[in-house]
């Protein structure tokens, strides 16, 4: 697919009411890397290696940029004036997500069986309980009226 056109015609007269055309570009690996809408700046996907997303731009303006660790897991996402930092446990589980707006920070706690047992944030803490066979049996939250049993 290198382009597409969308048109809207009047149902009775078939007169053209609206038309929009978008072109697409691909890199040497065949992955989409650019979308060019009518009369708008191009949207570009910045990738590396086998197609890992490193960022996106609208014209010359960066929309989002990603930093990854050697396992290609996202560790930092920058978008506008915000930065989201993500950390992982040695087992590869999500450990924390911290946004430079403190109300959006989250910490994740896992038990020795690899089960998520707590998500903590400034607004609430959500705890999970499991049966001996590993089935989720309950969710308790510090927010009112949200417990599930």
Spans of features found by a protein language model:
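Acidic/glycine-rich beta-solenoid
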Residues: 1-149
